[in-house]
Design a protein with these regions (language model features):
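C-terminal accessory segments of extracellular proteins
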Residues: 372-387
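Alpha-amylase-like alpha-glycosidases and glucanotransferases acting on alpha-linked glucans and related
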Residues: 1-86, 111-335, 339-341, 346, ...
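Short Lys/Arg-rich cationic patches that frequently serve as NLS/NoLS or arginine-rich RNA/DNA-binding motifs
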Residues: 389-397
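Conserved, well-ordered alpha-helix/loop/beta-strand core segments that scaffold catalytic motifs
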Residues: 78-110
Length: 397
């Protein structure tokens, strides 16, 4: 379908769309490397660049030049796909913004090994001379995982990144800030320190902790891209060093209510214990169960504490109670999901980390949008003093 659209576009390119396309290509220099990467993947039957012939795998200048000439038309096809996507995306974003809606986007900390970034910027990653990773990312064994988590992503060479004044990360964040109104940085604690596992290990055993770039990186990002518009996903082991980084960066941190219900009442995730307004409270996230699904899987003692704290008698009341305490908290921003508004359980969960097959399949139906839910959320937003000020329209003279 898109090949057909591209063919028609190529034959009839003219007018405003033609100029838009030229501008898009001129303003996005990353397109050349990305489109060549995609064209070469097609030419190699979808194989990872790690399996390409040595001259291309190592980006020999002559081999890359020849490939650009040979696959010029395929490269243009992939440039067209990007052009169409971003053209439509920015129309959608404008429509949302015009209706008072901001979009929060996620930016992962690491890249996939089989990506244009790693192939084209191999010097920025911990790879050997043959472009094979020396170490990969993950998380060590703990009480929740006997073998730890082996993510497998190549790890940045932070010394080289610093030598280049974090050029790659500045570009990445600048682009993300254009795509979204607010950017949530995934695994923020990994910038403080990271766990490096020898490449080839079958589990996360045998890895080592190393210092990350810490505030040095974010100081440059702030200087080059501006201070606002970022949320730090700081879930995990919060050490004094991580707290220091969060304070230096001054990004809002995350408070997930599902982490809050330690029966002692002392959890830092309980709204009464927030020490700063500079945070975002979540009823649940895309990686967690829904509030109702989470509650149904608790032990009896914790269930009783949750009910007492929220003042509810039945499980069905819990999602609304979660939204209520989130909205009435002192956090600068409060987040909930359609699943919570609809009172759905585990059947509506979006993602189970470290699994494949049935994730990211849940969809909101038109019937889920009810006048009752809208009125409830509107009123709660008003009495919680979370309604944005209404912009006064200028009178025509």
């Amino acid at each position: 379908m898109m090949r057909l659209a591209f063919g028609r576009f190529s034959k009839g390119r003219n007018g405003n769309v033609s100029e838009e396309y030229k501008t898009f290509v001129a303003e996005n220099p990353w397109l050349e490397n990305y489109t060549l990467f995609m064209a070469l993947k097609d030419a190699h039957g979808g194989k990872s660049w790690c399996e390409w012939e040595t001259p291309l795998r190592l980006r020999d200048v002559t081999a890359v030049y020849s490939a650009k000439k040979k696959y010029a038309k395929d490269m243009e096809f992939y440039a067209f796909l990007q052009f169409e996507f971003f053209r439509q995306w920015y129309k959608l974003k404008k429509y949302a913004n015009d209706n008072g809606i901001q979009i929060i986007g996620d930016i992962p900390i690491y890249c996939a090994l089989d990506s244009a970034d790693v192939w084209c910027e191999s010097q920025l990653f911990q790879l050997d001379r043959d472009r094979v990773p020396t170490v990969v990312a993950g998380f060590p064994p703990d009480a929740f995982s006997e073998d730890g988590q082996l993510w497998g992503n190549p790890i940045y060479d932070w010394d080289r990144m610093k030598q280049e004044n974090y050029r790659w990360w500045v570009g990445r964040m600048s682009f993300a800030k254009k795509l979204y109104d607010i950017v949530r940085i995934d695994h923020f604690i990994g910038f403080n320190s990271y766990y490096a596992i020898p490449f080839g290990n079958k589990t996360a055993h045998g890895g080592e902790w190393h210092d990350g770039p810490k505030y040095d990186l974010f100081n440059v990002i702030k200087r080059e891209t501006g201070k606002g518009g970022i949320i730090a996903e700081d879930l995990g082991i919060i050490t004094p060093s991580v707290r220091k980084l969060l304070k230096q960066a001054a990004y809002p941190s995350m408070k997930v209510l599902q982490f809050a219900f330690d029966p002692t009442g002392k959890s830092e995730y309980l709204p009464q214990n927030y020490t700063s307004q500079n945070c975002v409270v979540y009823t649940s996230t895309h990686d967690s169960d829904t509030a109702l699904g989470w509650f149904n899987n608790l032990d009896r003692k914790t269930k009783q504490f949750v009910k007492e704290y929220l003042g509810v008698r039945h499980a069905a009341e819990l999602p609304e109670a979660f939204i209520d305490i989130a909205w009435k908290s002192t956090a600068d921003m409060a987040m909930t999901t359609m699943q919570e508004l609809c009172g759905f359980g585990t059947e509506a969960r979006i993602n189970v980390p470290s699994t494949i097959g049935n994730n990211w399949r849940w969809r909101t139906l038109e019937s889920d949008f009810t006048a009752k839910s809208a009125a409830y959320l509107d009123r709660l937003t008003e009495i919680s003093n979370r309604k944005p000020p209404v912009k006064k329209s200028r009178k025509k003279r």
